[in-house]
Amino acid sequence: MDDNANSIRILHADDEPDFAELVAVYLQREDDRFEIESVTSASEGLDRLSETAFDCVVSDHDMPSQSGIEFLEAVRERYPDLPFILFTGKGSEEVASDAISAGVTDYLQKGSGTDQYVVLANRIQNVTQKRRAEQEAEQIQTRLEAITANSNDTILTVDDEY
């Protein structure tokens, strides 16, 4: 098993280090492919994103100096396709609406039980699997276009609906 190909690298931004550690423990219990790096601010998160490739960002909303929505907007400017999950205890319809407008991949409210980590782990798995499938489809499309552009053979495309 190739650990790099199967691992899921997650950047978790939360200004409460103890909670971030708890999240990492629960997520890794749900899926041992998860590699979680925690940061305590959006600016630290942006620095880490510029240094290391991640498969997904999970962020709190209520952080000092820059909110989770502002962090999301900064991530979208630089990494428009990177899955971003807002995982917050300060949720409201307004926050959810702002997150959707800013291009959040998913939104999940923190709860008091451990079931929330099962849901969060599932959502991380889903968004990273979807992104990887999209990237693979793009690579296949690019290779196919290169093959057809450089081929001396005639390629016939049939549309059954025409």
For each feature predicted by the language model, list its residue ranges.
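Helix N-cap/capping motif at the beta->alpha junctions
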Residues: S38-D47, G68
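Conserved acidic segment of CheY-like receiver
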Residues: S7-L27, S38, V57
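Receiver (REC) domain switch/output surface
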Residues: Y117-R132
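PAS/LOV and related PAS-like sensory modules
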Residues: D3-N6, E21-V25, D98, A137-Y162
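Active-site residues of response regulator receiver
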Residues: D14, D60-H61, T88
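Receiver (REC) domain active-site loop signature in two-component systems and cognate sites
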Residues: E51, M63
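Active-site beta3 strand of CheY-like receiver
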Residues: T52-V58
